[in-house]
Amino acid sequence: MTSNEKEMMNSIFAKIAELDYIKPDEIPNIDLYMDQVTTFMEENLASTKRHEDDKILTKTMINNYAKNKLLPPPEKKRYSREHLLMLIFIYYFKNILSISDIQTLLGPITEKYFKSMTEKDMTYIYQEVFSMEQTQIRYLEKDLMRRFKSAGEVFEDADPEDREFLHQFSFICLLSFDVYMKKMIIENMIDHMNSSKGDGTSKKEK
């Protein structure tokens, strides 16, 4: 591993270490206006930005989510704790899934848990999902090192001045293939959900 490659991997691991999810007890229990919502999201998800001037969520985005029924409409222009939890899910999903796919995923969650009066509410869903975070981060770090080593074992006969770039190119190709395959699996699962939903509807109609 060259000094440049070591510096790159240290930078990647430092970025991963900075990532954190919003803890349930950090989410306000009072309703917020739109400006307060965007400020809250901006402050608490800043570590996920690629560039400093990137926006986490804008008013236009949030209005579009409500218009497309990804998000229940606010009550008297105020957004509840449940709205914030839904927006966090949407924020992560929107980078890899289409609006219609997010609708398929979040529709049943909204219907059953959004205004639940039992202990199994949106906070329960959020806590259960994000409780897996630390385990996944540890796995990710080990997996990244394994893939980086694999990428460094190819192009052994390349010109020395090209080898470092080609190793990085191979590493990116490995990661991209992984992302592509996982995205395809997610889309297939969502298609199956849609298909099952359709079958259920047709059976009821019969």
Q: What do these predicted regions represent?
A:
Residues 2-110:
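Basic helix-turn-helix/winged-helix DNA-binding cores
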Residues 108, 112-206:
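Intrinsically disordered, low-complexity, charge-dense segments enriched in Lys/Arg
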